[in-house]
Amino acid sequence: AFVWVANRSTSTSTLYDGAGVPQSLVVSIPPGVAGNARPTGIVFNGHSDFMVTANGMSGASAFIFAGLGGTLSGWSPGVDQTHAITVFDGGNAGAVYTGLALASRGASDFLYAADFRNATVDMFDAAFNKVGGAGSFVDQALPPGYAPYGIQAIGERVYVWYARQGAQTGVAVPGAGQGAIDVFGTAGNLVKRLVAPGGALHPPWGMAVGA
């Protein structure tokens, strides 16, 4: 088994084997209008959509990255083995993506990017077009200052975890009780509050589900 890691400081992604040994492949994530990509979220795409094109070649993205620079980038080894291709740039809108998820709804696939700065979850179709209404992924009961910080799709549910926005862009306020988790449907409808603010959570970012 291999593990892909998104490297925020170098705007790259590196590959490791199951023993933690780095492999020779290093993928560069291109900058956007707001500067370096600084990838934080990475998802595997096992389908034939989310196409990227460069140098006269097209192919489905095997991995898709989101980052603090507000970009989405897709990597297809048949298009460019060592570089991802920018497919969306939200830098002019101030987007700061701190997490990324991929889920299916019916026969269609969608990406979900947690925009910590603008306090939204941006939803994209399989052609990287932003979709979804203004009321998607909204919890009116959250206290002011909370924003989506991480995201994970599990089955037909999208789990969004929140943190309080700090003074520095993309950095959450630390401390116990500063985190919250909501559960949404893949269309962005709120299903339930899983963990309320003021509980045991520090700002949560990752989630894993045991078999």
Residue ranges and their predicted role:
Residues 1-3, 31-62, 69-71, 89-111, ...:
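Beta-rich, blade/repeat-based domains predominating
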Residues 5-28:
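Beta-propeller domains
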Residues 10, 20-22, 79, 118, ...:
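Short coil turn/linker residues within repeat-based beta-strand modules
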Residues 11-14, 72, 119-121, 181:
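Structural signal for beta-propeller blades
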Residues 16-18, 75, 124, 184:
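Hydrophobic/aromatic beta-strand positions that recur at structurally equivalent sites within the blades
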Residues 23-33, 81-91, 130-142, 189-199:
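A short beta-strand motif characteristic of beta-propeller blades
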Residues 124, 176-187:
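Beta-propeller blade signature
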